[in-house]
Regions:
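Conserved PLP-enzyme active-site core in the AAT-like
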Residues: 1-193
Length: 193
């Protein structure tokens, strides 16, 4: 949507580095209405329009204040894009928060997308680290593009260990963070109605 992190906060990287043309739809606090992205999907349009190859969704929505996307809405978009051969990517940097807030399994979110990115530092407390998930073929291609962009790292075992620790020991504590955030928001609302 128009407030998506990949559009607002990445300095136009998709266009600058990859020549990608992006289109976006309006939303209320980032909440997904399946009609939004589907109104922009174009396939089989000949040589005069750009065909849609990817729909990107964000969960939770950063600039929407942490809006959690309903799994039903995500499934509806997937059911519409899949027959058209349009891939889906989840910017799931904060997916852990959606999982904890809704009880929806991480795998239930993941199975709706061709690729998913998650961040190990946002919410989980790892010092750094993001992970891209997808099929073996897509990950092989992603490794090639990572190398082309000069994004490889060496000696990352210590960072991987921190990420594994965060997954094993911090995910279940996110509900405590949610409770503290709700108390803080309530106190702010009471202090400044």
């Amino acid at each position: 949507d128009q407030q998506a992190h990949v559009l607002r906060a990445e300095l136009g990287a998709a266009a600058a580095f990859s020549g990608i043309t992006s289109r976006s739809w309006p939303s209320e606090r980032g909440l997904l209405d399946p009609a939004g992205p589907m109104s922009l999907v174009t396939t089989g349009v000949g040589p005069y329009q750009v065909e849609t190859s990817l729909v990107v969704l964000e969960n939770t929505h950063n600039f929407g204040g942490g809006t959690v996307q309903p799994i039903e809405a995500i499934r509806e978009v997937r059911a519409s894009t899949q027959p058209l051969g349009v891939a889906m990517h989840l910017d799931g940097a904060r997916l852990w928060n959606a999982h904890v807030a809704t009880g929806v399994a991480l795998s239930a979110y993941g199975e709706q997308f061709d690729t998913v990115s998650v961040c190990l530092s946002k919410g989980l407390g790892a010092p750094v680290g993001s992970v891209l998930l997808g099929s073996a073929d897509r990950m092989a291609e992603a490794r090639i593009w990572r190398k082309r962009y000069g994004a490889g790292m060496r000696q990352v075992g210590i960072l991987a260990a921190a990420g594994i620790h965060a997954l094993d020991h911090h995910l279940h504590r996110l509900s405590d963070d949610h409770a503290r955030a709700a108390r803080f928001a309530a106190a702010c609302a009471e202090a400044a109605p």
